[in-house]
Amino acid sequence: MSQIHPTALISPSATIDKTATIGPYCIVGDEVTIGAHTVLHRHVVVTRLTRIGEYNQFYQFSSIGEDPQDLKYAGERTWLEIGDHNTIREACSLHRGTEQDGGLTKIGNHNLLMVNTHVAHDCLIGDHNVLANNVGVAGHVTIGNHIIVGGNSGIHQFCTIDDYSLVGGATLVLKDVAAFTMVSGNPAKAHGLNIEGMRRKGWSKDSIDVLRQAYRVVFRSGLTTVQALEVLKQDLLPKESKIEFLIDSLQKSRRGVVR
């Protein structure tokens, strides 16, 4: 049987796994699903229409699955999905999607959202990411995998933050952040590769050296994006398969990448 504190308020339409824990003064609303071994510590509100996986931790004063802050929203049935092994610290706000963009906000697995992080409607967040204190993620943003976003940073609507990148503290991101890059400033500018992140993943020196070459081609050579892509594909991709991540970033970007 689930461990539910007597002061918690649970909707009859909520589904809570028998191994989950619902702490004091939590509220679990309509059509909420909470998976195995997930813990709502205390004073957590899961408003409605939210699916939460296994082994997640939610800390006090978090607001989960609230209506989107979008003037077009008119009460449609939209959803928030949260995967497994995530830690959501104090006072985070995670909003559901809007009908105009698929009706879903989605957070993957093994993410750490630190104090007062906001994830707006229709965002898609992958796996193994860290969003530090007071990060604001506007609507329709895509954040990939293995990314760190420094505290007090803001990410503009519709931007993409690609895999293995690093956003420095107090950064304003107005364009897409290419894979592997390190950006900071207001507005954000590229300041090299996320070398320390690569080393922590155990990547070889040879792989990192090829990625350094790729960075210089794209960001420091003066070539157009089309010209840089040709060099990456013809000269560097045969040497290192991870170059494909950078190629993909450049090809799919609609806002242009931070340079």
From Swiss-Prot:
It is an enzyme of class 2 (transferase). One of its GO terms (biological process) is lipid A biosynthetic process. It comes from the Bacteria. InterPro entries: Acetyltransf_C, Acetyltransf_C_sf, Hexapep, Hexapep_transf_CS, Lipid_A_LpxA, Trimer_LpxA-like_sf. Keywords: Acyltransferase, Cytoplasm, Lipid A biosynthesis, Lipid biosynthesis, Lipid metabolism, Repeat, Transferase. One of its GO terms (cellular component) is cytoplasm. It catalyses: a (3R)-hydroxyacyl-[ACP] + UDP-N-acetyl-alpha-D-glucosamine = a UDP-3-O-[(3R)-3-hydroxyacyl]-N-acetyl-alpha-D-glucosamine + holo-[ACP]. Its EC number is 2.3.1.129. Transmembrane segments: none annotated. It is found in: Cytoplasm. One of its GO terms (molecular function) is acyl-[acyl-carrier-protein]-UDP-N-acetylglucosamine O-acyltransferase activity. The keyword Repeat applies. Pathway: Glycolipid biosynthesis; lipid IV(A) biosynthesis; lipid IV(A) from (3R)-3-hydroxytetradecanoyl-[acyl-carrier-protein] and UDP-N-acetyl-alpha-D-glucosamine: step 1/6. Gene3D superfamilies: Hexapeptide repeat proteins, Udp N-acetylglucosamine O-acyltransferase, C-terminal domain. PANTHER family: ACYL-[ACYL-CARRIER-PROTEIN]--UDP-N-ACETYLGLUCOSAMINE O-ACYLTRANSFERASE (PTHR43480), ACYL-[ACYL-CARRIER-PROTEIN]--UDP-N-ACETYLGLUCOSAMINE O-ACYLTRANSFERASE, MITOCHONDRIAL-RELATED (PTHR43480:SF1). Homotrimer. Involved in the biosynthesis of lipid A, a phosphorylated glycolipid that anchors the lipopolysaccharide to the outer membrane of the cell. Belongs to the transferase hexapeptide repeat family. LpxA subfamily. This is Acyl-[acyl-carrier-protein]--UDP-N-acetylglucosamine O-acyltransferase.
